Amino acid sequence: MNKNGLWNVLKKQFLPGQTKDGEKPKLTKYHYFLFVFVLGVSFMLVSQLFSSPEKTENAKTITAVSSQHSADSKEKTAEVFKASKSDKPKDSIDDYEKEYENQLKEILETIIGVDDVSVVVNVDATSLKVYEKNKSNKNTTTEETDKEGGKRSVTDQSSEEEIVMIKNGDKETPVVVQTKKPDIRGVLVVAQGVDNVQIKQTIIEAVTRVLDVPSHRVAVAPKKIKEDS
């Protein structure tokens, strides 16, 4: 329906016809109000019809973006999980010793004048895990009366500790607050070029700072140069 058709319908419904004397119809406030109301409703219906396809398209776009974001998140989570599973936990003393030895060898060979480095690290034990605990203290006071009628109070103090556990699937695992690395008993570095006093002192200082061990636990010795056969 065009604008003129809509206008004619509204005019017939809400405007009074001509009077018997042929005079022009008089519009009251009621007619103006009713006309504006119907016109506003008509505009709302028309705008809703035109906007519905656009909203549907926007909803489809939002759904597609959300699905893509969810897929990307799952993929990233899977990558992190695979990387975590590939990391081998260090459960033995040998694992810690090998790790320290490889790290020291790699860094010491970058020092000027140092070559062909061999490292031996001796650790005290494996790592120490500190678990979260719930502590509770109890005080019990007992009134005692002896045969002579004397009274005395006896207070008994007791404390209990319980490791905090959390569910991990079908199992319960303790909550780890801190993991302490094992103490190091001694370090031996054998390399070419350490016969130079300054280079030797540099290696000792580097090892003591990296591993947090006193200098008297670090030994540095020159390596024998292999002769060509």
Swiss-Prot record:
Main location: membrane
Compartments in which it is found: Cell membrane
Disulfide bridge positions per record: none
GO BP terms, alphabetized: sporulation resulting in formation of a cellular spore
Coiled coil feature spans: none
Annotated transmembrane regions: 30-50
InterPro entries assigned: Spore_III_AG
Membrane topology: Single-pass membrane protein
Ranges annotated as biased composition (Basic and acidic residues): 71-93
Gene Ontology, cellular component aspect: plasma membrane
Protein name listed in UniProt: Stage III sporulation protein AG
Source species of the chain: Bacillus subtilis (strain 168)
